[in-house]
A protein has these predicted regions:
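Transmembrane beta-barrel domains of outer membrane proteins
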Residues: 66, 87-89, 216-220, 229, ...
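Extracytoplasmic beta-strand/coil segments of soluble accessory domains associated
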Residues: 2-44, 62, 72-92
Length: 318
């Protein structure tokens, strides 16, 4: 995203959000609905078709953008969507120079969670909804209260079908004042399992550590110019089981063998391991696989864990 805001008209979007995911770059807008609108990347004079996140930013000396006729004149049709020229580092001083840098940081969700109703308010709101549905159709208050009492936990008839409160025998969960019974205790056991709601937001999102290390050596003489580097990145995401690890290496050597002969090599290696939960199931963004969707829409009465009758989290032996 370094080029965003530095070149007029360039757009960069990272719609995925997963650690290590490459951004979508548009230099000349959208010119086709069926063909690719991605620019051509050229690294040290060679067209590059790989993932941009595979290039260690610490190895980049400069980045420039061609977006006008110059792109077409040099690269033809391949430059129709613009060209991004990347030049990697080389030696600047004659003496051998070793550079090491380490970076530490933290990844956190900066957008606060919505202010949502709690467990008690959710039951109260559902009860009031059932009551009003009968009043709206002409039923008496007594009939409406009776309907709400019977239907609140009846999933087949529009109720919640789920109880996470222990209510004394003979008493109702919600009174005729539409408030939770003060004698109701959060947490319910049927003898086999214990039911209590969890904070899905706190369970799904967390602040995690990010660390990056890079070391390079470079130098030059009248005939030799060399640059070599290795890098390691461990970037943990803000949701559980999301992370990106990258190992990079680069060796760039130029040698003036004769006045008329110059030989060189530029080799790069990248190994990356990316982990991220599914953000959609098929074509449905509102699926249970989308943790962002679920954590923001699930009712505050449902648990995240299966618990034993004593309240401890059940562990699957398999």
């Amino acid at each position: 995203r370094d080029s965003s805001g530095q070149v007029a008209g360039i757009q960069t979007v990272n719609a995925n959000g997963a650690p290590g995911a490459s951004a979508t770059v548009r230099i000349r807008g959208i010119g086709s609905m069926s063909s690719s609108n991605a620019p051509l990347y050229v690294v040290d004079g060679v067209p590059y078709d790989g993932d941009m996140s595979s290039i260690n930013p610490q190895d980049i000396e400069s980045l420039s953008v061609l977006k006008d006729a110059a792109a077409n004149s040099i690269y033809g049709a391949r430059g129709a969507n613009g060209v991004i020229l990347i030049t990697t580092k080389s030696a600047k001083t004659e003496k051998a120079k070793v550079t090491f840098d380490a970076k530490w940081g933290s990844n956190s969700r900066m957008v606060p969670q919505y202010d949502v109703i709690g467990t008690a308010e959710y039951y109260e709101t559902q009860y009031k909804t059932l009551y009003n549905s009968k009043i709206y159709t002409g039923s008496s208050k007594a009939e409406a209260y009776n309907y709400a009492d019977k239907t609140l936990l009846d999933a087949k008839n529009g109720g919640l079908g789920y109880l996470v409160y222990t209510v004394p025998d003979g008493e109702k969960l919600i009174g005729n004042n539409f408030k939770l019974n003060p004698n109701a205790k959060l947490g319910y056991s049927d003898g086999k399992y214990y039911y209590t709601p969890d904070d899905w937001y706190d369970e799904v999102f967390s602040s995690n550590f990010r660390q990056e290390y890079n070391v390079n050596i470079s130098g030059r003489s009248d005939k030799l110019n060399y640059y070599a580097s290795v890098g390691y990145l461990n970037d943990s995401g803000i949701i559980q089981n999301s992370a990106y690890k990258r190992y990079t290496g680069r060796a760039k050597v130029d040698y003036q063998a004769k006045e008329w002969l110059k030989v060189g090599t530029n080799i790069a290696y990248t190994y990356s391991d990316s982990q991220a939960p599914d953000y959609q199931d098929g074509d449905s963004w509102g699926s249970s696989a989308n943790l962002f969707y679920v954590s923001n829409t699930i009712a505050p009465i449902y648990p995240l864990y299966v618990r034993n009758a004593d309240g401890s989290i059940a562990i699957n032996p398999n």
